[in-house]
Each structure stands twice: as C-alpha cells, then as structure tokens.
Amino acid sequence: MKTFTAKPETVKREWFVVDAAGQTLGRLATEIASRLRGKHKPEYTPHVDTGDYIVVINAEQVRVTGAKSSDKMYYSHSGFPGGIKEINFEKLIAKAPERVIETAVKGMLPKNPLGRDMYRKLKVYAGAAHPHTAQQPQELKI
C-alpha cells in the first residue's frame, strides 16, 4: 500500500467562523493555527496547504490570564536606529483588536512561503459582523 500524499489541486477547503468572545488568547490561537495548517484532517501533508479558512469574530472580547493584560508587550521596529516601538496588550486591544489574534496565530505557523499562504486564510474582525456570509461558514466551537 502506498503512502497517500495530498495534491494542492484536490484539497477541499471549508469555511469556519469562530467566536472569540471570552476565549483565552493562547488556547484559541493554537486551535486556529492547527486548523489553518490542516492537521485536523486525515489527508494532512506537511508540504501541502491542506487547511481551512477561519473567520474570527469578536476579537475585541478575547482575554488573557493573570497580569498579562498590562504586562504583555508587543514590539515592532521601523528599521531605523532607535526605531523600536512597544505597546502593551490593553492598549493594542483598544487600538487594533484584530492584531492581537493575528500576531498570536502568525507566530504558530511555519516561517516560510507555505506558512504565509496559510496565514492568508485567516480573517479576523473586531465585532460580530463579517463580510463572508456568501461562503456559508460553519460555526466552530473551541
């Protein structure tokens, strides 16, 4: 019996919607990253993008445990000397709530072209409304 290998043109992708309200950031991000990679499918192949599309709603209501809301820092750099910027979780969730989930999930995906393709299948929205109703996403309980 030969080992099955998924082909990119035969992969069937589904759409799922995840409600992040009241969810813990890390636990939510690990499940999303796993589904973006396709590891929940029996036909998972490491060198082929077999994952599904994930739509995350209510990103502004995601939570972290302990004192991380004030202690967890997000860093960015402009590329110029002295160009490092930092912002904590509380301020970032008020300024751009989508970036919190996007950053957490992106760090859990492969750092190569395949990982960037997987990341493009993640759609995050601050509120409950999203423009992907035409794809008829199924609700995913995490």
Curated annotation (Swiss-Prot):
Pfam families: Ribosomal_L13. Keywords: Ribonucleoprotein, Ribosomal protein. It comes from the Bacteria. GO terms for cellular component: cytosolic large ribosomal subunit. NCBIfam families: rplM_bact (TIGR01066). Part of the 50S ribosomal subunit. PANTHER family: LARGE RIBOSOMAL SUBUNIT PROTEIN UL13M (PTHR11545:SF2), RIBOSOMAL PROTEIN L13 (PTHR11545). This protein is one of the early assembly proteins of the 50S ribosomal subunit, although it is not seen to bind rRNA by itself. It is important during the early stages of 50S assembly. This is Large ribosomal subunit protein uL13. It comes from Pseudomonas entomophila (strain L48). The gene is rplM.
